[in-house]
């Protein structure tokens, strides 16, 4: 495992400041490998059936999860989004970091929803983008092209600069976070 730009989060940890860390949904399975800090962390996982598998794997690695996802517009069915948001805000208030895939649980792929921006604004916490690259991997035929690294694959992890969210329009922060995640993803996948 190779870490790049870890100073971005080390400085937050030294200041005892927890944060929201953001990663693309296709990298969700391996996101626990990014975590080498003193803070507790919770990772948001959907309530869909595929989320059950990912939640079990991440829990097996020693991490806790928050289960919830959004419903499609016009649907009455609640998939736990409101409860998950309350748990996330409570966790952030109690000095716990939270990991969120801003393009999950149903996409579109590599597009930032406004949920993570709203959580950052309500909690007054920074968003720290992170990306993982693998020199050998399988890419599943799913909406997000979910990545499963092959055994003995080298992992490259890069942390971006923290993003503070103010009262400006969500769209500018969505674009900023997308650009940072895309650049980090490009950089971590450029190694052999």
Cite the ranges covered by each PLM segment.
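Non-catalytic C-terminal accessory region of glycerolipid acyltransferases
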Residues: 36-39, 56, 60, 64, ...
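A short, well-structured juxtamembrane/interface segment
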Residues: 1-18, 24-30
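Pocket-edge structural micro-motifs
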Residues: 5, 23-25, 45, 161, ...
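Short, flexible loop segments at the rims of nucleotide/cofactor-binding pockets, characterized by
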Residues: 1-2, 20, 75-80, 106
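A short acidic, often aromatic-flanked loop/helix-cap motif at beta-alpha or helix-coil junctions
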Residues: 8-11, 72-76, 163-168
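Catalytic core of membrane glycerolipid acyltransferases/transacylases, capturing the structured
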Residues: 20-77, 123
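General small-molecule cofactor/ligand-binding pocket signal
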Residues: 2-4, 66, 158
């Amino acid at each position: 495992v190779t870490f790049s730009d870890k100073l971005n989060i080390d400085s937050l940890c030294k200041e005892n400041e927890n944060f929201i860390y953001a990663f693309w949904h296709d990298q969700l399975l391996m996101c626990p490998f990014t975590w080498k800090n003193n803070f507790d962390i919770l990772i948001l996982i959907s309530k869909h059936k595929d989320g059950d598998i990912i939640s079990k794997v991440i829990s097996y690695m020693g991490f806790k999860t928050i289960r919830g996802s959004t419903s499609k517009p016009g649907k009455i069915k609640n998939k736990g989004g409101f409860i998950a948001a309350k748990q996330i805000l409570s966790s952030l208030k109690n000095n716990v970091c939270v990991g969120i895939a801003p393009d999950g649980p149903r996409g579109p792929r590599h597009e930032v929803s406004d949920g993570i921006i709203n959580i950052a604004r309500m909690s007054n916490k920074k968003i720290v983008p992170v990306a993982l690259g693998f020199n050998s991997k399988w890419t599943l035929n799913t909406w997000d092209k979910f990545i499963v690294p092959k055994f003995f694959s080298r992992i490259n992890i890069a942390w971006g600069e923290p993003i503070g969210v103010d009262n400006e329009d969500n769209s500018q922060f969505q674009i900023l976070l997308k650009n940072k995640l895309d650049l980090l993803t490009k950089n971590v996948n450029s190694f052999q």
